Amino acid sequence: MNEHALKNIPLRLYNTAERQKQELKPIKGNHIQLYTCGPTVYHYAHIGNFRTYIFEDLLRRTIQFFGFSITQVMNLTDVDDKTIRGAIAKGITLDEYTKPYKDAFFEDLKTLNIQSAEYYPAATDYIPAMIEMIKVLLDKKVAYKGGDGSIYYAINQFPRYGCLSHLHLEDLQAGASERVAADEYEKEHVADFVLWKSYDSERDGQIYWESPFGLGRPGWHLECSAMAMHLLGETIDIHVGGIDNMFPHHENEIAQSEACSGKKFVNLWMHAEHLVVDQKKMSKSLGNFYTLRDLLNKGFTGIQVRYLLLQTHYKTQLNFTFQGVESVKSSLQRLNDFIQRIYNIQTLQSDGQVDLLVNDALIRFAEALADDLNISSALAAIFDFVREINCLCDVNQVSQKEAETVINLMKKFDTILGVLTFDKREESIPVDLQEAFAKRQQARQEKNWTLSDELRDFIHQRGYLIEDTPQGTRLKKQ
């Protein structure tokens, strides 16, 4: 398996800001700094969230596949409009409200075999860093105090505002007299956005922090800027999230971070498309809102859900159906059965085709991933390889040594997929076949060739072979 050839394949990823694919070139050496938007822990994450997290996991694994080292930060938003409302409604502290959802999120990551990030910062642990950023923005006259006591970002003081979502600042009607205090809003409501939300006892209960600007709490957009810059530096290689994060969240992150540091915040932006259910937007009112736990309760496994969310390109809208999950079962079964078949190869000689097929499959797989994570083409390379090797197995043209190479390639594929099983299964031979085999052995000793042949044919009809080995005669699945 020629892994050296992978070094000559450039990894090209689609940059949302530039609207084109670009070769990944690290800021420092061979190391990638990756910031991925994590959950707002006001509820259990739903399968639409996990579509994005699976994409982020695919990106992380691909970066490593091509030989880069990585530091990944995935934030946990544990203070925002929704978490505060939830805590107040239940009459508990913010931490008491968010902790069960944080714990559940990490359980779900494990269930889906999503690799761990190096850092999972919670917003409430970085309030001092956020306050310091606001001080800098106020000093630079990019932020101001509104009549409601909150601190706002003046978007007309940042000429590049709109660079990510391709809005034109001169066309916007925002200004000091137009502000938005909500964490989430649409493009038609573009306005100066909140950095520090002034405390309101009716709205916020007992949830607030002290600051030089008065009691309150940070705006959602500021949280990610502060955590990203604190943990990864003023300029990072890649920032990733769902397409719904692009505006206003990521747009506002750029404005805050670059105004604060005077440097480019992110070199490459990537966004995953939405997930829909049966071609409809997921919503509780339509009864098509599913968490991972809902799917597990319906009998599906985390690996099946992972494969389903993985197999569609991240820039394509993913249509979730239960028929789709069922089809995934057969795909995984085919791959895992293939692995078991290769484990059972006993042939010592072959015609030498396997090494060529292994190298071709690896290059096809790598080139597909290098083309903006083209997972459908990567999967096609795997299934073509499985078909070709199965054909060789049918005519006993895969040796034991080559079988090891095939297994190693499947393990290499699974560093990306994270769905295969490599535990060798011991076949359980039915009792009646074991009895027939023992009777045949006895018949041969007694030279009862007619009975011996009848029992051999019975065993063959049931899908088993009688194989002679150095350890003696045994039954083997065909």
Swiss-Prot record:
| Chain sites annotated for binding ATP | K284
Q: Which InterPro entries match?
A: Cys-tRNA-ligase, Cys-tRNA-synt_Ia_DALR, Cys-tRNA/MSH_ligase, Rossmann-like_a/b/a_fold, tRNA-synt_1_cat_dom, tRNAsynth_Ia_anticodon-bd
Give the residue interval(s) assigned to the motif 'KMSKS' region: 281-285
Q: Which CDD domains match?
A: CysRS_core
Name its co-factor(s): Zn(2+)
Binding residues annotated for Zn(2+), in chain numbering: C37, C224, H249, E253
Motif interval(s): 'HIGH' region: 39-49
Q: Which residues form the signal peptide?
A: none
The compartments listed are:
Cytoplasm
Assembly notes: Monomer.
Please state which protein family the record places this protein in: Belongs to the class-I aminoacyl-tRNA synthetase family.
What this protein is called in its record is Cysteine--tRNA ligase
| Organism expressing this protein natively | Protochlamydia amoebophila (strain UWE25)
Gene name for this UniProt entry: cysS
